[in-house]
């Protein structure tokens, strides 16, 4: 974490520059769940109800509406080095959890195009993760 002296806020800076690999398959698309970490929460419509499920070691939840999993290359972690610095800019370690929320199983949808019902599902997931913290 580093202090931005223009905005007077702390910002998170990825020390590895956050280069994303050029993948031939989209790891966020349904059917490619094995390309990501196991989900900690997947919302699934079953029997007319929204159920909260999670992946197991040898089983990935299918037909999910929203999926949450730990990032493969997290920017923050609960295991961090205590590296404070004053020069050239003030910095301190960033500590926390880095999750990926896949808001829709539809590859072409964006946050501005998903339905109100799907937005509601995303907010349920965010609320769940905040309560967990």
Q: What kind of feature is each model-predicted range?
A:
Residues 1-133:
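Active-site microenvironments that recognize anionic phosphate/pyrophosphate groups
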């Amino acid at each position: 974490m580093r202090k931005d002296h223009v905005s007077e806020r702390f910002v998170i800076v990825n020390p590895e520059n956050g280069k994303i690999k050029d993948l031939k398959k989209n790891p966020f698309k349904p059917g490619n769940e094995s390309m990501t970490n196991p989900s900690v929460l997947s919302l699934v419509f079953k029997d007319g109800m929204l159920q909260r499920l999670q992946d197991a070691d040898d089983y990935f939840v299918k037909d999910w509406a929203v999926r949450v999993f730990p990032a493969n290359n997290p920017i923050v972690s609960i295991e961090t080095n205590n590296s404070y610095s004053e020069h050239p800019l003030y910095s301190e370690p960033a500590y926390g959890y880095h999750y990926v929320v896949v808001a829709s199983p539809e590859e072409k949808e964006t946050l501005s195009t998903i339905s109100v019902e799907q937005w509601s599902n995303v907010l349920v997931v965010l609320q769940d993760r905040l309560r967990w913290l």
